[in-house]
Amino acid sequence: MNTSMQTYLVTQEDRSAGRSTTEIVEAAIDGGIDIVQLREKETTARRRYEIGQTVRTQTAQAGVTFLVNDRVDLAAAVNADGVHLGDDDLPVTAAREVLGQDAIIGRSVSTPAAAQRAEDIGADYLGVGAVYPTGTKDVTAESAEIGPKTVTAITDAVSIPVIGIGGITPSNTTEVIRAGADGVAVVSAITTADDPAAATRKLQGSVDTASVESQLPSEEPSA
C-alpha cells in the first residue's frame, strides 16, 4: 500500500466546537493531513451520507485519502478509498469482496495476536489503541490505555503499517512514533483546536521530528 499515513483525522462533528465536519476537514487539508476518516456515529445514515459526499469531493480535489468508519455500504456509496473496521463490523474479507482489491481496509486492534490475525486476513493497516486515556471513543477494558509498549509489541508482530490512536496530542506523538507507529490518528487534537489547520501542521511537525529521531542510533551509555 503506497499511501502516506503519518497524520490521520477521525471526524466527529459533536466535538468540533460548533463547526461542521466539512469545515474541519477543509482546515485539516489546508494543514497537510494525510488521511480523513468519516466517523459521525451520532448522526443519521442519511446525514452521514450527505457529509460523506462532500468530504469525498474535498479529499479527492486535494489528493487526500478518504476512509469511512465501520460502514462498508456507506464507503461504497460515496466512493471512499476504503473503510476502517472494528470488532463488531464486517470481517475484512467480506469488506474486501464489496469494495474490491484496491480498497484500503484498516482494522482496530489492541493486542499482537489480534494484529497478526488482521494481517493474515488481508488488512492493509492497523489502528492500535487506545494508546492513552480518551473520551472520544468507546473502548473495552482490554483496549483501554494500552500504552507505547503494546504499540511496540504490535509493530514487531506485523509488517503492515500501524497507526496509534487514543488520547494522542502533539506532546505525546514522539513517544508513539518512537514506539514504532507509522503515524497517529486524532480527533480532538484537531477538531477542538481554535485553528484546526495550525493544529494539523503542528501534529505533522511532531511526527516528522519523531520519525527522524527514531532513526538515529541510540547513544551508548557512558562507562
UniProtKB/Swiss-Prot annotation:
The UniProt annotation places Mg(2+) binding at D70, D89
Cofactor binding remark: Binds 1 Mg(2+) ion per subunit.
Q: Which UniProt keywords apply?
A: Magnesium, Metal-binding, Thiamine biosynthesis, Transferase
Instruction: Please give the residue ranges the record annotates as the region Disordered.
Output: 197-223
Entry-linked CDD domains:
TMP_TenI (cd00564)
**Chain positions recorded as 4-amino-2-methyl-5-(diphosphooxymethyl)pyrimidine binding sites:** Q37, L38, R39, E40, K41, N69, S108, K137
* This protein's GO CC annotations: cytoplasm
Q: Name one GO biological process term.
A: thiamine diphosphate biosynthetic process
Residues that hold 2-[(2R,5Z)-2-carboxy-4-methylthiazol-5(2H)-ylidene]ethyl phosphate according to the record:
T134, G135, T136, G167, V187, S188
- Which pathway is recorded for this entry? Cofactor biosynthesis; thiamine diphosphate biosynthesis; thiamine phosphate from 4-amino-2-methyl-5-diphosphomethylpyrimidine and 4-methyl-5-(2-phosphoethyl)-thiazole: step 1/1
Q: Which domain of life is it from?
A: Archaea
Q: Which reaction does it catalyse?
A: 2-[(2R,5Z)-2-carboxy-4-methylthiazol-5(2H)-ylidene]ethyl phosphate + 4-amino-2-methyl-5-(diphosphooxymethyl)pyrimidine + 2 H(+) = thiamine phosphate + CO2 + diphosphate; 2-(2-carboxy-4-methylthiazol-5-yl)ethyl phosphate + 4-amino-2-methyl-5-(diphosphooxymethyl)pyrimidine + 2 H(+) = thiamine phosphate + CO2 + diphosphate; 4-methyl-5-(2-phosphooxyethyl)-thiazole + 4-amino-2-methyl-5-(diphosphooxymethyl)pyrimidine + H(+) = thiamine phosphate + diphosphate
Q: What is its EC number?
A: 2.5.1.3
Q: Which Pfam families has this protein been placed in? A: TMP-TENI
- The biased composition feature labelled Polar residues covers 206-217
List required co-factors. Mg(2+)
Q: Which residues form a coiled coil?
A: none
A molecular function GO annotation: magnesium ion binding
Family designation: Belongs to the thiamine-phosphate synthase family.
Q: What does this protein do?
A: Condenses 4-methyl-5-(beta-hydroxyethyl)thiazole monophosphate (THZ-P) and 2-methyl-4-amino-5-hydroxymethyl pyrimidine pyrophosphate (HMP-PP) to form thiamine monophosphate (TMP).
**Protein's recorded name:** Thiamine-phosphate synthase
Q: Which organism is it from?
A: Haloquadratum walsbyi (strain DSM 16790 / HBSQ001)
